[in-house]
Amino acid sequence: MFVVVGLLLSGCGAAGSGNRTLARALPPDAEFTHPGVLVSAGQLEDMRKNVTAGKEPWLTAYLDMRDSKYGAYKYRAEPYEDVHCPAGGKAGQGCAQEREDALAAYTQALLYTVTGKKQHAEKAREIMDAWSAELKRHSGENAALQAGWTGSTWARAAEIVRYSEGAGWPADRVRRFESMLRTAHLPEVARKVPDVNGDRDLVATDAAIGIAVFLDDHDTFDKALARFRDRVPAYFYLDKDGRLPLTPAGSGITTPQRLTSYWHRQTTFKSGVTQETCRDVEHVGHAVAATAHIAETARHQGVDLYSETEDRLAAALDLHAGLQNSGRAPAWLCGGEVEGKLGPVLEIAVHRGIGGPATRKLAERTRPAGTNDLFVAWETLTHGG
């Protein structure tokens, strides 16, 4: 069903996505593998086979997706020229609409993959074409966050539709969608912001790497890898980092007081604590999801980020999954009060063998993982098992 594009990478390393060999970087002359944003052709085919065979947990996950508002044949996009997203709960314009429409396009693309029904491909194209004809910019204090959430989802949806046989996306509409991502999303998500909360930076990087693959943009891809490698060690603490956490490269976090404030008043550091644990666990979940998305997309392109980050990600997952499973926090952590839940963000890590019994227990208990209505969607379906 998929037109798979890409050259084989040479060199030593573990087997990667398909026949690619995993390395630290993508050679400048290497082609990108398509589809290859979060999900590969092989994963999409496995998903289809598991659903049509009635296997669990994929069947229930599929039915939940199909029956969601995003899966409706009658879904209607609501595009805006200027998506304005202010901070502090102020009224915006087009923010929820773009997030939901991007998720709907991705949902319809997955439905087409499973069913082969052209109505789903047509709906995904209709949504993406509506936005590419209208959107010019993101504005407001949360412009980069909005562009990150939606850019990552748009790239996933577009990648599947573009490289699915029979999806019928005209070349001129593909080019227009490329232009939208290049002009309305990429400038926002490519901008370095080392002093922000880490989930925002990782979400932006998630979008940047997905857009880079869709655009066959080596420079943006390489910059996303570098940004990821800077941010992850400064977000997910391990005992080996020393008494204090590492700080983001280029940040102004240069004193103990600033570090304490940046870590939301946490002053005791043990493996698994993250920069936002004492903010709330939901934002930790966003960072976990983005980290897994980036590593998964990189893997499909032959780049191994998992080996660099799995110890940090596993420690964070086990700590926060344990907190959620038990409902209690130790006194040393956030004064004994940790708020929120991780959300539907565990499946990719579990699929890659990252995390221990606490993480797997929570993943199995909360299946099927649905969507957070921001940028995470249907990962039991795509990566479960």
Predicted features by range, described:
Residues 219-226, 238-247, 302-309:
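Short acidic alpha-helical/loop segments enriched in Asp/Glu that coordinate divalent cations
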